[in-house]
Structure formats: structure tokens, C-alpha cells
Amino acid sequence: MQLKLKNHKANIFEQLPFDSSKKSIVFLPGAGMDHRILSMFNLEELHNGHNILGFDLPGHGFTSGPIVNSIDEHSLFCIDVFDQLDIKEPILIGHSWGGLVALDLSTKVEHDMTICMNIAYPFLVGDMLLDFAKGNLDQAVEFLMKYGIHKFPKTEIKTKGFGTMGSGFYGRKKGQIKSPYGTKVVEDDPEREIKLYPLKRLFNQSEKEISSIDLKSCNSFRLTEEQISGLKNIKYIFSEKDKLARFNPENMLLQNVNHDEDIIILEDVGHFPYFESPEETNKALISIIKK
């Protein structure tokens, strides 16, 4: 659905038609991604009692309007959507950068639950990745694949188009692959490139520097001590082999958390568990929400 907000025309993807009588589950994608992340999840068990929504944040997907540069501004955009749809006490699910937006939102609105997947805090992004994201997004995505992917899924992921942004990501010419962000030769391991396509395509955006903008906002995002101590109804999903957002049991966010009940560590997966091990990821989310 398309919503006309004060400063944006917001695109909200619905897995089923929105029903105001149902509790809403809101997905907030990672840096440079959009609503198409929902193509990686199967949450049919939750359809009867829940709306499952994927937000295109400013500069992402099909949301139009001014780019915003901070986690806080993205949270305010989400609040505008909640107000227009009259969404009360949502279940927030954010992956990576989107997990920071979800965390910040949980300090601003009443929420039934917030699930932060694969986040670090502070979430510090290195200069090399920032430079790649600014100059050649294809290099940045390759960096994320190199350090973020631990294994490929057992079953090949069948992707849906989700509109024009899901098609034509690569153009081939004389053994090279041309993406919107650069040209490279993949003759050494073309099968790897094909296997990664369902995930890589999610970074294809009309706003070519949006990943850079998102990643910079990770570095500057901080909660106050009062906000951290006041966090409630927060659940965390980490990945055993995640090199981009490593689980640290001593992290300040986790000091007042019941580690047995509120933290799940997915085994043998990296930073993108919904790609690497979708069934286990779906089971984890459903078990948390149904508990």
C-alpha cells in the first residue's frame, strides 16, 4: 500500500491485506535493503492473527521523499506510518541496521515486543566498507557477502520479482557481470554469484548511496543510559558465525536481559540467517512471537 505522509509517500508491503483488527508485525530491513526482505521469510503460521508488514524506509524501495540521515529520523518516519494506520503496540523486527531502528523505536512507542536480529551496539562500521558503499556499492555488497555469509542455504531460494527492483540486477557481457554499481569478472566462481543473487538483489536501490547513508548512521547511533535501562520487551537473535555483528554477552544492552529467555543464538550461520538457514530462522521468530 502507498501512504501519503507529511514529507514522504511511504510504501508499505503487506503479505496479506491489512486488517486493523489484527496485531501488526513490522519488518525493518538492514542497511540498503527494502521490503523485499520479506521474500526470505515464511511466517504463514502467524497470518491468522497478525498483519505482516515490510516498511520501505526513506530512500529505500518505493518510498519517495527526502532522504533522512539518522536512526532517529527513520524512527519518526515509522511513527508517522503507525499513526496513519492506527497501529498500536506493534511487534517490531529489525535486522542489522534495521535492528537499531527497531531498538530506537522501542524507546519511543509502546510495543508488544521488539526482536533485534544480528545487531551490535555500538554498531561501528569500518572506513573500508564506508568507502566502498560511497563509491562502488557492488564492492560494498561483496564485502558484506565475504564477511557476512557463512554458508549457502541447503535448498536454492526461489525469488519473486517484487517489481522492477527485483529484475535485471546483472547484465552479462563477454564473461563479465555488469551490475548497476560496477563491472567485475566472475569467471572463477560463477555459481557462487548465482547462489548469492537472491540476497544481493535486495541491495539494488534507485538511490545509489543509500547504503552509505545507512551505514554512517550506525556509527553515530547511541542511546542514553536512561533509555538503555528503560528497555523492555526486547528479544535478541544472534548468529554463531556472524563476523559483522558478533554476540557479546557482556554488551551493555544485555546487562538486564534474561539470557536464557530473551536471547537466541542460531548455530552455524552468519550475518544473514534468513538467507543461510531460513527454516531455522522462521522457527526462531515464530517461537518468540507465540511464546
Segments predicted by a language model, with ranges:
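Catalytic histidine-centered segment of alpha/beta-hydrolase-like enzymes
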Residues: 244, 269-282
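Conserved alpha/beta-hydrolase catalytic His-Asp/Glu region
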Residues: 131-230
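Conserved HGGG/HGGXW glycine-rich cap/lid loop of the alpha/beta-hydrolase fold
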Residues: 8-64
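Conserved alpha/beta-hydrolase "nucleophile elbow" surrounding the catalytic nucleophile
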Residues: 29-31, 90, 94-96, 239
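N-terminal cap/lid segment of alpha/beta-hydrolase-fold proteins
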Residues: 1-9
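Active-site loop/oxyanion-hole signature of alpha/beta-hydrolase fold enzymes
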Residues: 8, 47, 51-93, 97, ...
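Conserved loop-alpha-helix segment in the C-terminal half of the alpha/beta-hydrolase fold
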Residues: 44, 230-269
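Conserved hydrolase catalytic core segment
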Residues: 88-125
